[in-house]
């Protein structure tokens, strides 16, 4: 890639740096979301805490424009739906 102008070179460096930061944040969100769902399905005590942490990470990513606000809302909604489904399944099972 032939970037001839200094400003273009700098913007390219900055975009690569931002890309790494954004990828890291998105991977962390995915990890905590999966952990929260698995914990809820297994009936773990820390499922609510993991859910809260995942939602917090999603909100922070949306605030910093790593995620679009609508994408963040969608992720939070789907996470809550999955956790509620897991809780309902746990409650339906005989003890």
Curated annotation (Swiss-Prot):
Binds directly to 16S ribosomal RNA. InterPro entries: Ribosomal_bS20, Ribosomal_bS20_sf. One of its GO terms (biological process) is translation. Residues 1-26, 76-95 are annotated as: Disordered. Residues 80-95 have a biased composition (Low complexity). Keywords: Ribonucleoprotein, Ribosomal protein, RNA-binding, rRNA-binding. One of its GO terms (cellular component) is small ribosomal subunit. Pfam families: Ribosomal_S20p. Disulfide bonds: none annotated. This is Small ribosomal subunit protein bS20. It comes from the Bacteria. GO terms for molecular function: small ribosomal subunit rRNA binding; structural constituent of ribosome. Belongs to the bacterial ribosomal protein bS20 family.
């Amino acid at each position: 890639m032939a970037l001839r102008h200094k400003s273009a070179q700098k913007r390219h460096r900055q975009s690569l740096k931002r890309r790494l930061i954004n990828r890291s944040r998105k991977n962390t969100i995915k990890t905590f979301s999966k952990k929260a769902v698995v914990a809820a399905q297994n009936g773990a005590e820390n499922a609510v805490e993991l859910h809260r942490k995942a939602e917090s990470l999603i909100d922070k990513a949306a605030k910093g424009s790593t995620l679009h606000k609508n994408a963040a809302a969608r992720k939070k909604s789907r996470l809550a739906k999955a956790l509620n489904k897991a809780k309902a399944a746990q409650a339906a099972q005989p003890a």
